[in-house]
UniProtKB/Swiss-Prot annotation:
Name of protein: Nod factor export ATP-binding protein I
Chain residues that bind ATP: 38-45
Keywords: ATP-binding, Cell inner membrane, Cell membrane, Membrane, Nodulation, Nucleotide-binding, Translocase, Transport
Subunit and partners: The complex is composed of two ATP-binding proteins (NodI) and two transmembrane proteins (NodJ).
Membrane topology: Peripheral membrane protein
Domain of life: Bacteria
Primary localization class, coarse: membrane
Top-level enzyme category: translocase
Function: Part of the ABC transporter complex NodIJ involved in the export of the nodulation factors (Nod factors), the bacterial signal molecules that induce symbiosis and subsequent nodulation induction. Nod factors are LCO (lipo-chitin oligosaccharide), a modified beta-1,4-linked N-acetylglucosamine oligosaccharide. This subunit is responsible for energy coupling to the transport system.
Family membership: Belongs to the ABC transporter superfamily. Lipooligosaccharide exporter (TC 3.A.1.102) family.
Amino acid sequence: MSVAPIDFQQVEKRYDDKLVVDGLSFHVQPGECFGLLGPNGAGKTTALKMLLGITHPDAGSISLCGEPVPSRARHARRRVGVVPQFDNLDPDFTVRENLLVFARYFGLAAHEARALVPPLLEFAKLENKADAKVGELSGGMKRRLTLARALVNNPDVLVLDEPTTGLDPQARHLMWERLRSLLVRGKTILLTTHFMEEAERLCHRLCVIEEGRKIAEGAPRTLIESEIGCDVIEIYGPDPAQLREELAPFAERTEISGETLFCYVDDPEPVNARLKGRAGLRYLHRPANLEDVFLRLTGREMQD
């Protein structure tokens, strides 16, 4: 695709007197995985609904696969696969039947739909579950089936809303591996997620939104370096305020969340030296990550 598969320009959406999407702008490049991150109620799902033409924006412009939305949303969606936040598989059908029926929605002939099923089952690692009812599948299997179903029309763009919510770590990693294989095949992916590790592993770029506004955008590593830029020492124990006073001179920045003190350090040794052998304290020295960025930007439970 020569044009940006997804483009938002100064998009606004209001419900009654509440502005839930406020001048949101971003674009997604062909073959890119782009993440929308934000706390609950930030406007992520509303943005996806507007992208798909389900909800109409009050201002701004949206294009999907080169088509203006909402006026040409139905046409654009023929080149898009969608994985909703909650599975909407038909429980009365088998795994195979779910794929066959969905393929017919895109106008595929019966023989074309049947030819699609084996490679999709292989992709989802469900070859041995073709004749199983949906109710017999694990949560991870259902999510992979939903992803396979989103591929029946060979879409250019995939839109995924919280694709691994509710999955155990093993199922989540398998889903990530499947998504990475789609990127290798040149698919463009837009996803929302609450899992910072997921965003860091999958996304080439991401946009952090809060209260409908974009507050940061960039590659995960770039955001980590610009917003945090150092190592982190997490210290768990009583009286974090007293510890903060003691350790602040040896840190670039400190934050307290509950009973945890976060020390952001360029040189961890002075802080580590003062923590060794302390009774009643536990601490963890680690590289800065995307969760640190998210908490710093959104301010959730953190106080400077």
